[in-house]
C-alpha cells in the first residue's frame, strides 16, 4: 500500500463540478492499493501517515505530526501509484489491486483515519477527479508498507 503525502496549506477535490472534500492546513494523501495489500497493511500505513512528523514545531524543526499540528487529512484514491514503470513507454498496472479490493481497502483506510479522531475528507473512489492543492514547503513523501 502506497501513500504519497503532501503537506498543504489547503487542498480540495472536485468530482463533476462538486467539491467532495476540502481541507485547510494538513495532509493531502494520494493512496494506491497493490495486489497483496490487506487490512494489516492499511493499519500500518494509517499509523505512519498520521504519525509522520513533517510539521514544524516552535523552533522550525519538522517535529510534529498532523494531529499535533491541528491539521486535517484529504484522502484521494490514485491507482496510478501502483504502476510498474520499469520498462517501456507505457505504465503497466499489473501490480494494482482489483477495483473491488482496492475500494474496500481505501474505505477501510479512511475509516481508520476517522477512528483516530482525525478530520478526514475524501475524494470519490475511481472517479475522474480534479485535485487542487497548495503544497507547503514543498514537502512531499512517499510512504509504502
Swiss-Prot record:
A molecular function (GO) term: Ser(Gly)-tRNA(Ala) hydrolase activity
InterPro entries cross-referenced by the UniProt entry: Daa-tRNA_deacyls_DTD, DTD-like_sf
Signal peptide range: none
Catalyzed reactions per annotation: glycyl-tRNA(Ala) + H2O = tRNA(Ala) + glycine + H(+); a D-aminoacyl-tRNA + H2O = a tRNA + a D-alpha-amino acid + H(+)
EC number: 3.1.1.96
Gene Ontology biological process terms from the UniProt entry: D-amino acid catabolic process
Coiled coil: none
Residue ranges annotated as motif Gly-cisPro motif, important for rejection of L-amino acids: 137-138
Highest taxon, organism lineage: Bacteria
General function of this protein: An aminoacyl-tRNA editing enzyme that deacylates mischarged D-aminoacyl-tRNAs. Also deacylates mischarged glycyl-tRNA(Ala), protecting cells against glycine mischarging by AlaRS. Acts via tRNA-based rather than protein-based catalysis; rejects L-amino acids rather than detecting D-amino acids in the active site. By recycling D-aminoacyl-tRNA to D-amino acids and free tRNA molecules, this enzyme counteracts the toxicity associated with the formation of D-aminoacyl-tRNA entities in vivo and helps enforce protein L-homochirality.
NCBIfam families: D-aminoacyl-tRNA deacylase
Family that this chain belongs to: Belongs to the DTD family.
Domain notes: A Gly-cisPro motif from one monomer fits into the active site of the other monomer to allow specific chiral rejection of L-amino acids.
Entry protein name: D-aminoacyl-tRNA deacylase
Species in which this protein is naturally found: Escherichia coli O7:K1 (strain IAI39 / ExPEC)
Gene this protein is translated from: dtd
Amino acid at each position: 500500500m502506497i501513500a504519497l503525502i503532501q503537506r498543504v496549506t489547503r487542498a480540495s477535490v472536485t468530482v463533476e463540478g462538486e467539491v467532495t472534500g476540502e481541507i485547510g492546513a494538513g495532509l493531502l494523501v494520494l493512496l494506491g492499493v497493490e495486489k497483496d495489500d490487506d487490512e494489516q497493511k492499511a493499519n500500518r500505513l494509517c499509523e505512519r501517515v498520521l504519525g509522520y512528523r513533517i510539521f514544524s514545531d516552535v523552533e522550525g524543526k519538522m517535529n510534529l505530526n498532523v494531529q499535533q499540528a491541528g491539521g486535517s487529512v484529504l484522502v484521494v484514491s490514485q491507482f496510478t501509484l501502483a504502476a510498474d514503470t520499469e520498462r517501456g513507454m507505457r505504465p503497466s498496472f499489473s501490480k494494482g489491486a482489483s477495483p473491488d479490493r482496492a475500494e474496500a481497502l481505501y474505505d477501510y483506510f479512511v475509516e481508520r483515519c476517522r477512528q483516530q479522531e482525525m478530520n478526514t475528507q475524501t475524494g470519490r473512489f475511481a472517479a475522474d477527479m480534479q485535485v487542487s492543492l497548495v503544497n507547503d514547503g514543498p514537502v512531499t513523501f512517499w510512504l509504502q508498507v
